[in-house]
Amino acid sequence: MRGRVAGSCAPLGLLLVCLRLPGLFARSIGAVEEKVSQNLGTNLPQLGQPSLTGPPNSEHPQPALDLRSNDLARAPLKLSVPPSDGFPPAGGSAVQRWPLSGRLPAMYSWPPEDPWLMMAAAAADRLGEALPEELSYLSSAAALAPGSGPLPGESSPDATDLSPEASHLHQDSESRRLPRSNPLGPGGKILSQRPPWSLIYRVLPDHPWGTLNPSVSWGGGGPGTGWGTRPMPHPGGIWGINNQPPGTSWGNINRYPGGSWGNINRYPGGSWGNIHLYPGINNPFPPGVLRPPGSSWNTPAGFPNPPSPGLQWG
């Protein structure tokens, strides 16, 4: 009987223990949360200053923060949010840890403004303050209009306060503003004002297009000879001429002028295609006479031809 009672009480005891454990865990977690919130309120170091509550770390000593040279580094530090994974921040105290429930304190809520815009504005302000006097002077001088600069005879009030490097840069900027001289001279200005087709002055006035000016050479071939051509030995000749004297016809190979086209006679005045040795002769008889007197066209075939040479055609 006792064994049965002990066996039935064991499951009941385990059940009661399981029901009590969550309550105990919840109470312990609540106590830890209260302690952490109190520690955060009292031991939270000021922003931009190292933590004084944490134990010193001999292996990784923290260098002293330079407030003058670390202005840009403080802006991201103000906007940085502690990690939410439960690990303490580097260099902080070991007590500073987030609660296990995941709830964030009210003091670590996000700001209403965009953090990136705030970072950019802060960086621009710090960068403007960190610019040297020379760069700020150059940036202000570049913003001025080209005609609003001081006269050469006048001296600016801050010219004496500038360093030698700044004065040298100022002289360079002034020299760049001066108008540059034209390397081509007055001729270059004239060419720049003329259109690309200004070469028409080579053409004679009051003449149609294409008439060349004999006083201007167009390629070294002599005045009025065309683009880069050689002067003709006989201006009166025509294309394909082998004759030396001028005035001969096209393709004539005679040695004397006045011959007709294709004539191979040695004397001028011959007819076209004539191969006789004497010019102007197509018949041994005078011009207009084909047969001598007494001859007839109706000579019978049985009779011989008369011995006169005029009976035959030449």
From Swiss-Prot:
Biased composition (Basic and acidic residues) is annotated at 167-177
Q: Where is this region: Disordered?
A: 41-65, 77-96, 147-191, 292-314
Tissue expression remark:
Taste cell specific.
Read off the InterPro entries from this record. Answer: C6orf15
Signal peptide stretch = 1-26
Provide a GO CC annotation, any one: extracellular region
UniProt subunit comment: Binds to numerous extracellular matrix proteins.
Q: Where is the composition biased (Low complexity)?
A: 147-157
Enumerate the Gene Ontology biological process terms: extracellular matrix organization
- Gene name linked to the record: STG
Q: What is this protein called?
A: Uncharacterized protein C6orf15 homolog
Keyword Transport attached: no
Instruction: Report the subcellular localization.
Output: Secreted, Extracellular space, Extracellular matrix
Q: Where is the composition biased (Pro residues)?
A: 303-314
Name the PANTHER family for this protein: SIMILAR TO RIKEN CDNA 2300002M23 (PTHR15817:SF2), STG PROTEIN (PTHR15817)
Q: Which UniProt keywords apply?
A: Extracellular matrix, Secreted, Signal
Biased amino acid composition, Polar residues = 41-60
What is the predominant subcellular site recorded for this chain? Answer: secreted
